[in-house]
């Protein structure tokens, strides 16, 4: 009887401790900010793609579509982690401005630069401190992808200014798990970030 009571008290104590464990407040805040940022980027890049098409810049439009898909995957991943922490994301409306494709590319470069050099490093520092491993993973996938997007956008802007957009990739592949993005002619056998086989990639 004493053993049963002791075991029961341990279980109750564990449940009580679990219920009263502190929430990773900063990481929750960062996940929400990341969801807003990635969702907005996804919608914005689709709008940029339509603008590029209207200007006859099909290769740049493809790049924007691929990046939009990747950003959407990042938003979904961030949302899953947030919900596993018992928090729901509030509704919001993405806000952005569409200009010329040259201006849109520069805006995209600026956004990706901020995310990879400032936003995600800060998010990762907080996630590591609060020991939220799944947040660390989704933030890392997003940050590493943004580095590649910046490179693609920088190349596209240079080719646009040189009136040589026909030399850009005519297609892209996006990992459905982490959002990693490849030029269609440079796809790995498996995603370099998460190991997903290339036959699962989304072809743009």
Each language-model region and where it sits:
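Non-heme di-metal
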Residues: 19-204
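Bacterial N-terminal signal peptides
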Residues: 8-15
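Intrinsically disordered, low-complexity segments enriched in polar/charged small residues
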Residues: 7-8, 117
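Positively charged n-region of N-terminal signal peptides that target proteins for export
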Residues: 1-5
């Amino acid at each position: 009887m004493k053993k049963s009571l002791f075991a029961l008290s341990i279980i109750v104590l564990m449940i009580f401790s679990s219920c009263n464990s502190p929430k990773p407040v900063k990481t929750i805040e960062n996940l929400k900010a990341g969801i807003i940022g990635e969702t907005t980027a996804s919608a914005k890049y689709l709008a940029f793609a339509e603008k590029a098409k209207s200007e006859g810049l099909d290769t740049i439009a493809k790049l924007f579509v691929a990046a939009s898909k990747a950003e959407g995957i990042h938003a979904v991943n961030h949302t899953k982690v947030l919900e596993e922490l018992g928090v729901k994301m509030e509704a919001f409306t993405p806000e952005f401005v569409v200009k010329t494709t040259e201006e849109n590319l520069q805006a995209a470069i600026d956004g990706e630069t901020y995310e990879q050099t400032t936003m995600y490093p800060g998010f990762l520092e907080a996630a590591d401190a609060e020991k939220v491993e799944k947040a660390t993973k989704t933030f890392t996938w997003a940050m590493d992808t943004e580095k590649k997007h910046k490179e693609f956008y920088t190349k596209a802007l240079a080719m646009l200014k040189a009136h040589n957009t026909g030399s850009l990739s005519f297609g892209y592949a996006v990992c459905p798990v982490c959002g990693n993005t490849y030029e269609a002619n440079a796809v790995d056998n498996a995603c370099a970030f998460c190991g997903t086989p290339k036959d699962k990639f989304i072809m743009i």
